[in-house]
Amino acid sequence: MLSQEKRQQLDTAAAALQRAGAKRCVPLKVSGPFHSAMLKGAGEKLADALESVEIHDIKVPYITNVTADYVKSPADVKDYLTQQVSSSVRWQQTIERLIADGADEFVEIGPGRSLSGFMRKINRDVKVVNIDKLEDFEKYVNR
């Protein structure tokens, strides 16, 4: 929940952006300031917790949303996890990279279809599957 002062600041910023040419400004309905500088302290706590965790060699290539690039070494994993808490998500760049590297089917697991909607805006040619129930997951895996 935003304070009245913060709400007014957001309204002022949205109006300025629209005057500058933005087509629209949409407030997001989120439960916290995820992936923002406001969570830097949480990232530091995560870094402390990860100190005792051993990261093994990477066997399955994956892309971090911090850089929209592949994680190349186990030494980078903890740093990227910590940064992800308070860094912007490079979702579009990550998806574009995966598509460029041959991915043509994406699965969104969990409630809602937000990411699937973003996917369709990025590239309508890829297949997007939504799974929000265990039965749907089992059906997808056993197809």
Outline where the language-model segments fall.
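Acyl-group transfer acyltransferase/transacylase scaffold of fatty acid/polyketide systems
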Residues: 1-143
